[in-house]
């Protein structure tokens, strides 16, 4: 089954971006807390499908072994300890929805009242407010690596996150959704935080929530604290010094493709000294895994006892009892360290003694994806001025 909060749309076209209207009020900053998904609603996750969809998100080629494993139906029931999904409450129109914040996409799309009762059952749904405006002739559609899809209409409505409201914000309301999404009861939609240039609304892309409201904020930035085994936070408009150690290290962002792309200066495995082999990659809260070049992945798993690249499971696996080495990314002279336990993602099936790695190949994408496996170890500032990214170890 697909985990739709961890994947995003294929870009369907680019043109002049239509801006929403922020509510005029004093400049401010605020923090919004994630919430844990309901423990009463356990979910099965096909781990190779998570991997396949992450590759498809960026137009990558999914290896045949991963396709085969993803279609085999093998799945693991995902309890809280695997950090599968933490969501953020957002008021869309008059309804509070739990959305996944995704720095790797630029769409705000939601389950809506346009879906049938059977498709929306178990979800909070968006109902256009009395002041909402439907954009006639505007549509959106997303497609994922496992063949799942969603599409619908576009409205302008109010969207509130924390203490900030955007009026006339583009809201992509689902009117059609495939069965994979219907089965995922934990998530009501997605709020994209990439650059507005890759918004997928046709015929004209729309601005993201962040681009709409950033003029209201004390500073045009947001900071992400994803946590290991716990809900995290998003700070909008300010940097919370209590959430990180030492000083922030900043690096430039190449936003030409619409993503928060940066270049790391090298990497290291375990206690070994980092090398100077650069890694270009995207900081993406909407991807679970850390996807790296084949050579980097091979370097890592050479130091993992019993690790192998498994055709059966569609990726690197290892004995669950194995103690994993850390992975270090060098950014502007700062060593961003991911502890080894973060990289042990989950057993391949319920009760299995074989575990699936949180580091996998980027399958020749040409760049890496620094997903949640990496981000959970860092306080990360997404600063639109520059633009630039700031990194520091979490407090």
Swiss-Prot record:
Prosegment residue ranges: 30-70
Residue ranges constituting the Peptidase A1 domain according to the UniProt record: 86-392
One cellular-component annotation, GO: extracellular region
Reaction(s) catalysed (UniProt annotation): Hydrolysis of proteins with broad specificity. Generally favors hydrophobic residues in P1 and P1', but also accepts Lys in P1, which leads to activation of trypsinogen. Does not clot milk
Positions annotated as active site in the UniProt record: 102, 284
InterPro entries recorded: Aspartic_peptidase_A1, Aspartic_peptidase_AS, Aspergillopepsin-like_cat_dom, PEPTIDASE_A1, Peptidase_aspartic_dom_sf
Key word Protease present: yes
Any one Gene Ontology BP term: proteolysis
Summary of pH dependence: Optimum pH is 5.0.
Gene3D superfamilies documented for this protein: Acid Proteases (2.40.70.10)
Annotated signal sequence range: 1-29
Cysteine-cysteine disulfides: 320-355
Domain of life: Eukaryota
Subcellular location as annotated: Secreted
Xref: Pfam families: Asp
GO MF term set: aspartic-type endopeptidase activity; endopeptidase activity
Family note: Belongs to the peptidase A1 family.
Record-given protein name: Aspergillopepsin-1
